[in-house]
Amino acid sequence: MKAAVLYEVGKKLEIIDLNIGKPKQGEVLVNMKAAGVCASDHHVIHGQIPYPTPIVLGHENAGVVEEIGENVQGIQPGDSVIMSFVSSCGNCVYCRTGLANHCSRHYSDPEVQHKLFDNTFRIHDQEDTGIFQMNKLGGFAEKQVVPADSLLVIPNEVPPEVAALIGCCVTTGFGGIVNLDNIKTGSTVAVFGCGGVGLNILEGAKSLNANKIIAVDISDHKLEFAYKFGATHVVNCLLYTSPSPRDRTRSRMPSSA
């Protein structure tokens, strides 16, 4: 299969042929259909997030199940799936107490975080060098073996290029605000930064019936999108030095930012 591999920080991704193994217990082989390019991928490429190399990036993914390993339940070949960028082992204290997003085995070590849970590789290059998978996923590839617990089955009719974004920017943004307990009906919310995550925070604020939703960014293009995602007011901070964007939003009484 082909994949885009980062061999060295600061260098371009290399599209090369890789060998891929069979899914083991609790794992699934997925044909990747779409992968979002997240800011985190750029941070890794430029060394702003220390990840091991060589590595296949991509953690906003959608695909179709090709093969399942032993003891995989609720997933069948042919299922359309999206992926969580935080894999959970199901056995550590966090996973057992409903805090799987803090899985200690996933975050225990940078190298372990980007291998499968048995601490081995499923993909190798032609020199048999093991290739890391970003967050045990690695969507910048034609196929990947991933933990079954990272997958969520979705309706087949959902376009993969739409579904892929749910894996990070939607869950991070929308989930981040709807899981707060201080956003009530009628609240005023200010969102600083209207990238993929910020836009989904706006949508989450709208779903919580916030009264005023103020979007702050330096890009008019992003602020135009902000209106579509629920913003009632926008502020381009490059246009205001006095009062500052902070004071300008305060004048509209934000209860959360």
Label the predicted regions:
Residues K2, E27-L29, T188:
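Residues that mark the start of a beta-strand
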Residues L6-K12:
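Extracellular beta-rich ligand/substrate-recognition surface
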Residues G21-A35, I45-R96, A100-N101, D109, ...:
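Glycine-rich beta-strand-centered segment in the early N-terminal region that forms part
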Residues S40-H42:
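Cytochrome P450 core scaffold surrounding the K-helix E-X-X-R motif
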Residues S80, E142, D149-L151, P155-L239:
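Mid-domain Rossmann-like dinucleotide-binding core that forms the NAD(H)/NADP(H) cofactor-binding site
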Residues S87-K143, A148:
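Cysteine-cluster motifs in flexible loop/terminal segments that predominantly coordinate metals
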Residues Y240-T249:
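Conserved small/polar residues in nucleotide/adenosyl-binding loops
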Residues M253-A257:
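Hydrophobic alpha-helical segments, chiefly the membrane-spanning helices
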